[in-house]
Amino acid sequence: MIRWALPVLLFPYHAGACGLGLIFAIDVSLSVNDAEYELQMGGLSRALQDRSVLATLEQIEGGVSLALIQWSGQLDQEVSHPWRHVASRSDLSAFAHDIARTKRAFATETAPGSVIDLASQYHDQNPHACQRTVTDVSGDGVQNTGPRTRLSSAMAAGRGQTINGLVILGDDPDPEDFYRHNVIAGPDSFLEVATGFEDFQRAMRDKLLRELPSIVAQN
C-alpha cells in the first residue's frame, strides 16, 4: 500500500524559495536482496556526505529540499523521509545519517511508473518553492507491473519536472535500455549507470555532482 510519512496537503503550501527539490526514489523490489538494499542506502548516505557534494551544495542559493521514497509494486511506495530543507553541511549530514538507518518497507514487484506518478504529486507538497524539481529513480530491473513508465515520465515532464535515472546493471533483461528509453525525461534529464550494487555509491556521487552544479549555474 502507498504510505505517506506525513499528512498529504490538499493544496501546495510554499514557505520559501529553494534551488532544487530532489526526490530519491529507491528500488526495494524483490530483485533487491537485503545486502543490496544496504548498499543502496549506505551508498546514498555516504554520497551525500562526500566532500565535493557538500561543497557544491553550499553554493546553491536557497539550499535544496530533499525527500526519499521507497518503491516496489504498483501499490507499494512509502515516503520514508518527508521533505527536508537542507541549507548547510550539518543539515545534509543529518539527512544522510537518517537515510542510513532507514528500515526496508517492501519487497514485491517492479512498478517504476507508479513511483514516478507518486513523486510527481509529492513535489506539490514541498513547503518550499524550488527553482527546479527532480526525481531520481534508481533500480536494477525493468517494469513488470503498474502504469506504463514512459507515459508516467512524460506526464511528469509535461509539468516541468525532470526524471533522472540511476540504473544498476546485472539483471536479465538488461535494465539500461529500459531506463534510457522509458524512465528519464524532462529538462536536462540523464542516466547514470552503476555496474553493480557495489558501484552504487560512486554512481550516486557522480550523479549528484552532475545535478547540483547545474543549479549553481542558474543562480
Please name every model-derived segment.
Residues C18-P82, S93-S138, N164-P175, D199, ...:
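Von Willebrand factor
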Residues G63-D98, P175-N182:
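Short beta-strand-loop
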Residues G141-N182:
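VWA/integrin I-like adhesion module and closely mimicked acidic/polar interface patches used
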Residues R51-I60, T108-E109, P127, Q131-T133, ...:
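Surface-exposed patches in mature extracellular/periplasmic domains of secreted proteins
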Residues I168, P173-Q218:
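Von Willebrand factor A/integrin I-like adhesion domains
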Residues P12-H14:
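N-terminal signal peptide c-region/cleavage motif recognized by signal peptidases
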Residues A25-A35, L66, P82, D98-E109, ...:
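Second-shell loop/turn segments in exported
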